[in-house]
Amino acid sequence: MIRLLRLTCLLLIFATKLSFASVDFDTYFENKTLRVDYLLGGNANEQTVFLQQIKKESFWGGTTKNLVDSFNYGNFRFKLIDKASETLIYSRGFGSLFQEWQATPEAKMLNRSYYQVNVMPFPKHKAQFVIDYRNRDGVYVKLFEYEINPENYFILEEKAMDVKSSKLMGKGKASESIDIAFVAEGYTQEEMGKFRADVERIAGYVLNVEPFKSYADRFNIYALESVSEDSGPDIPGQHIYKNTVLNSTFYTFDSERYLTTSDLKTMHDIAANVPYDHIFVLINTDKYGGAGIYNYYTSCASDHKLSREVASHEFGHGFVGLADEYYNDSVSVEDFYNLKVEPWEPNITTLVDFDRKWKSMLEKGIVTPTPRTEEYEGKVGLFEGGGYMSKGMFSPVMDCKMKTNNKDEFCPVCQKACERMIRFTIGE
């Protein structure tokens, strides 16, 4: 009995150390950013981390309250653990182009690596930096760890890349706001006036959609005028190649509309000029495309007629962690989800653990699974199809911003997820 009591006490102490509510920012952190750069490399079955550099940057744009992640989102996560007290003092989940590439046919034949950057507040004392990956069974496994000594003179303290920046919207304090750094990609020096106007327009598109609209006064919007030699991104399928600051390209993973950059080093070098919670790469083109990867970045074409719809859809991926709800053959990934595991995204389910998804939001008396018929249009139910899979995966409504460009608003389930992320980020 005494041993049991001791064990219970030890478990309670350990749980307290991991409690996000117990972490005081000023005790553990400076109001600066610790940036860890590395390569994520491997193939369809393996992943490895290759450390590249560690930097101390001028601005911390994130919250000073919600320091430990409470969502459990992302195919990867990083943690910062205070060495002396063994307290978990910061953590976040994230996604990566590397993880998406692992689900392509090419990953079965060769190895690749993708640049990755994690940012967190700069620790006052020695801390252990840990990267975990989520395996096929949905369980996090340690991938890499490294001791961060804030006195280490190999931690770079370089001046940020010389890029003109301006605050176009918002008056809030960085730690209590959602700071979005819009990075210019494919804009020449002569096109910077257009870039600033494009930022205001695209940001306006996102902030006109609920629940972002209701919290619009909690957003700070920055424009970073990173100059490219050429105008527009690469379009490999048309043999068009441009010299741009972030080397953005259509046809990522041979999907024509997938418009991305792999140059996260330069992207973060540019963004370091301002405090930021999320980076939005605005790409100067009238061709349809974009991308959004959770806690990685959001990108969007500036001038396509559907850029309004694409901007909010991709921001749903990048900032909130929402899944795609479509299930046609227009993507290049294979078996992206294990149907025996509940996906981490809040707006799709395999029914393995539906209780923690939108079960409480189901329309009273609705049939489950819910037929995709006119009778159930606009109702919250359990509709088969989502996450690129037509069978075994379910989504909340027949149509949503995360499924097609036909909807002006997110569905109730996605709106709830968006609001949770907004409130977490602003420290509420």
Spell out what each predicted region is.
Residues F154-E210, A223-P233, T252:
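Fold-level signature of zinc-dependent metallopeptidase catalytic domains
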Residues M1-D24:
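Bacterial Sec-dependent N-terminal signal peptides
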Residues R218-Y294:
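Active-site-proximal segments of metallohydrolase catalytic domains
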Residues K194, A291-S312:
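Short pre-active-site segment immediately N-terminal to the catalytic Zn-binding motif
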Residues G186-Q189, V227-D230, T285-G290, K305-S307, ...:
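Solvent-exposed loop/turn segments at secondary-structure junctions
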Residues R308-E325:
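Active-site recognition of the HExxH zinc-binding catalytic motif
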Residues Y28-Y153:
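Beta-strand-enriched, solvent-exposed domains that form extended recognition/catalytic surfaces
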